[in-house]
From Swiss-Prot:
Part of the 30S ribosomal subunit. Contacts proteins S5 and S12. The keyword RNA-binding applies. The gene is rpsH. It comes from Cereibacter sphaeroides (strain ATCC 17025 / ATH 2.4.3). Keywords: Ribonucleoprotein, Ribosomal protein, RNA-binding, rRNA-binding. This is Small ribosomal subunit protein uS8. Belongs to the universal ribosomal protein uS8 family. One of the primary rRNA binding proteins, it binds directly to 16S rRNA central domain where it helps coordinate assembly of the platform of the 30S subunit.
Length: 132
């Protein structure tokens, strides 16, 4: 099955798995998805992930979800820049998610990073998603 928005598909899989209380969720592998998962792991929103090879050679990312006292750590996961409407922002315009309690994930020329990292590196880019 063809997916128009692979990153949006992965975020939806994570959101749905947490609503069901699953400990892990799988998603087809890609570099962008892995980079976003690296940021989520560094910010403490997921336990981690591992890449497993599949028969078709694409690979699969198995994501370990994180809970605190039975409640999902990720309360809100929103896709900002979509295939039909890309959202780019300069460093000074990067959004603050829930007054700094959440994180925006930005794709910059220096790689995929959190909004705080992008501000400290003084780079802007495409706002992929927000996490709270």
């Amino acid at each position: 099955m063809s997916v128009n928005d692979p990153l949006g598909d992965m975020l939806t899989r994570i959101r749905n798995a947490q609503l069901r209380g699953k400990s892990t969720v799988s998603s087809p592998a890609s570099k962008l998805r892995a980079w976003v998962l690296d940021v989520l792991q560094a910010e403490g929103y997921i336990r981690g992930y591992e890449k497993k090879e599949t028969e078709n050679g694409q690979g699969e990312l198995v994501i370990s979800l994180k809970y605190f006292e039975g409640t999902p750590v990720i309360r809100e996961l929103k896709r900002v820049s979509k295939p039909g409407r890309r959202v780019y922002m300069a460093t000074k315009d990067l959004p603050s998610v829930r007054n700094g309690l959440g994180v925006s994930i930005i794709s910059t020329p220096k790689g995929v990073m959190s909004d705080a990292s992008a501000r400290s590196a003084n780079v802007g880019g495409e706002v992929l998603c927000t996490v709270f």
